[in-house]
Amino acid sequence: YIKELSHVRGNVPDYRNSFDVAFILLICLIFCYNTYKKWVRLEDLIMLKDWNKVEQPTAEEVDKRLANAKNSLLQQQIAMKEKKLPVIVLLEGWGAAGKGSVLGKLIKNIDPRFFKVAVMDEPTEEEKRKPFLYRHFVKIPEAGKFVFMDSGWMSEVTSQKLSGELSEEEYKKRIESIKRFERQLTDNGYLLLKFFFNIDKKEQKKRLKKLVEDKNTAWRVSKHDRWQNKHYDECMEVYDQFLCDTNHSTAPWYIVDAKDKKWAQLQILETIVQGIDTAFANSALSVPLLQNAFPLKPISRLDEVSLDKSLTDEEYERLLDLYQKRLKELHNELYRKKIPVIIAYEGWDAAGKGGNIKRITEALDPRGYEVHPIASPEPHEKSRHYLWRFWNRLPKTGHVAIFDRTWYGRVMVERLEGFCSKNDWQRAYVEINEFEKELSDWGAIIVKFWVQIDKDTQLARFKERENTPEKRWKITDEDWRNREKWDSYEEAVNEMLEKTNTSYAPWHILESNDKKYARIKALKTVIEAIEKYEAK
């Protein structure tokens, strides 16, 4: 730089001259800025623009390493089943980069009972009426199995951004959703491996031309593929940004040199093998607990709730008729405006949840709602992320889903009965807040009820059920066992209410010693929530 300055000034710089010193400092600042930019890009692992290919081995070396990797994967499948490791392999990349052909070769190395392939084309009309992450979450595998995703959330988001469907603000929300989604998977023991098949513009054009010229493969070339090649640089910018935004240590992106398909297969196969080995080694580690990032509202503890509220029969009948008529009107508006509603019920056994739900559904068009009674998870549900079975039951836009028991079982019964680890249920408060935020951002109205009674009222209702033949089926040994743990459950419920009472999904406590009062309050609360949403 001093030599350059000498050339510009025509003489040797005088370090006592303030102008010379300033000039040298300016050049140093420019140098530091350029170095910083390069450092930031390396730190962020932007891999398309600044991507350096790994030198491709010889054909003999590729064949040898492929054989070793295939043998390793064969042995790992048995251990995966034993250790209950679920693996998601996401394949993204340029059109005609070879994802399909490489995928076909990859799955030949895996027992067909242990994997599924999910081809993520354009969202169906049904999927468009569900939250963005719905169609991706429901595809996750059972413990001990693979899911190979031919495209996924990257293709969906980048396509929408390139077409102008997503504003910059909407794009940022999608990125936050994806980061939460991926973190929840890896925190809950999933191995997530993300690959981007990279080829240059010239190579893509050559492959597309070859496909089009063969009548048996011409159908594989879409309008989007042609558009992508024509706007290669623009696509590169968007893909590059997405890779940067969603690259993190627990689920990094791997850029695959896809010019040679056998070499691409080796890169992926070796990465899968290494990833599984690492997951086995780290399986005993606890996941750090995150701080809640969503503002919480204060809420009363259960022992502070007054349970002496009641209604006369005349008041009850009058208000029931009034509120059910209003809810019926609102249900029509919800369908017309395509607003989804999620009503979640938790509460003590015999608190009156069933009768409460019945009074709400009496006001709804049966074609526009569904009630989901939630019991212990089935084996195929238990072997997936605990929220999976609730993602599967979400309503379409314009419809109502009512949950009799919910995802809050994670921090109540699963916590107290030891069905999950302490780290699992402590982490669940943030995960549930994130889940409900996803639903709220989608546009759902969320109403959560805790149905509260006192211990004496529960005992009286238990005895009534035992002594009434048509109600005897409602009382089980498990109800009596849970009653013995009343104090422990009350402590867990208070913590649940405190840590998940957000502005977008608040809790409402229904004082249900008098069932009539609780039913009317529930109807009124649902109506107010819908009217408040419509007024925004």
Regions of interest found by a model, annotated:
Residues Y1-Y15:
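Extreme N-terminal basic, low-complexity initiation segments
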Residues I30-Y33, K37-K536:
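Glycine-rich phosphate-binding loop of ATP-dependent small-molecule kinases
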